Amino acid sequence: MLKKLAWYWSFVELIKGFIITLRYAFKPKVTLKYPMEKGPLSPRFRGEHALRRYSNGEERCIACKLCEVICPAQAIVIEAEEREDGSRRTTRYDIDMTKCIYCGLCQEACPVDAIVEGPNFEFATETREELMYNKEKLLRNGEIWEEAIALRLKKDVSYH
């Protein structure tokens, strides 16, 4: 009797599994064939960091160091000096991407939208040294992604 009950239960469970399989076989697929297909990104997606420039080519960063102070991972290091006109500009702006937790606090703290997290999430490297971003690398990212970053910032709603 117990053997017959176990066989019956196994058969019923097998049929249930087939029914579930058939149900999902004819539904639209939810997976993407990455990297050929890419899904949509939220305007607030936080990817690779970039430093932006004004349209006249001047760096936006005013060396207020708010991003360095607010970074919970202490991944940002900034050194600055005063210029002849009295304004401050960075001489060193480094981000250790191995420490960064992509929280976006640096972007939120920046009063001039100088540091942003762009739409690029495909930046795999072979060595840890390549994940140490200096000012030149960050400015280059800003130049490459400026159009996409500006569009995303326009779509985004301010918290303030």
Swiss-Prot record:
Keyword Cell inner membrane, does the record have it? no
GO MF term list: 4 iron, 4 sulfur cluster binding; iron ion binding; NADH:ubiquinone reductase (non-electrogenic) activity; quinone binding
> For this protein, what does the record note about how its cofactor is bound?
Binds 2 [4Fe-4S] clusters per subunit.
Indicate how the chain sits in the lipid bilayer: Peripheral membrane protein
Q: So which cofactors does this thing need?
A: [4Fe-4S] cluster
Q: What is its main location?
A: membrane
Binding of [4Fe-4S] cluster 2, residues = C71, C100, C103, C106
Tell where it localizes: Cell membrane
Q: Which reaction does it catalyse?
A: a quinone + NADH + 5 H(+)(in) = a quinol + NAD(+) + 4 H(+)(out)
Q: What is its EC number?
A: 7.1.1.-
Residue stretches making up the 4Fe-4S ferredoxin-type domain: 52-81, 91-120
Xref: InterPro entries: 4Fe4S_Fe-S-bd, 4Fe4S_Fe_S_CS, NADH_quinone_OxRdtase_chainI
Q: Name one GO cellular component term.
A: plasma membrane
Sorted keywords for this record are: 4Fe-4S, Cell membrane, Iron, Iron-sulfur, Membrane, Metal-binding, NAD, Quinone, Repeat, Translocase, Ubiquinone
Its biological purpose is as follows:
NDH-1 shuttles electrons from NADH, via FMN and iron-sulfur (Fe-S) centers, to quinones in the respiratory chain. The immediate electron acceptor for the enzyme in this species is believed to be ubiquinone. Couples the redox reaction to proton translocation (for every two electrons transferred, four hydrogen ions are translocated across the cytoplasmic membrane), and thus conserves the redox energy in a proton gradient.
Q: Which family does it belong to?
A: Belongs to the complex I 23 kDa subunit family.
Q: How does it assemble?
A: NDH-1 is composed of 14 different subunits. Subunits NuoA, H, J, K, L, M, N constitute the membrane sector of the complex.
HAMAP family registered for this protein in UniProt: NDH1_NuoI (MF_01351)
* Name of the protein in question: NADH-quinone oxidoreductase subunit I
Q: Which organism was this protein described from? A: Wolbachia sp. subsp. Brugia malayi (strain TRS)
Q: What is the lineage of its organism?
A: Bacteria, Pseudomonadati, Pseudomonadota, Alphaproteobacteria, Rickettsiales
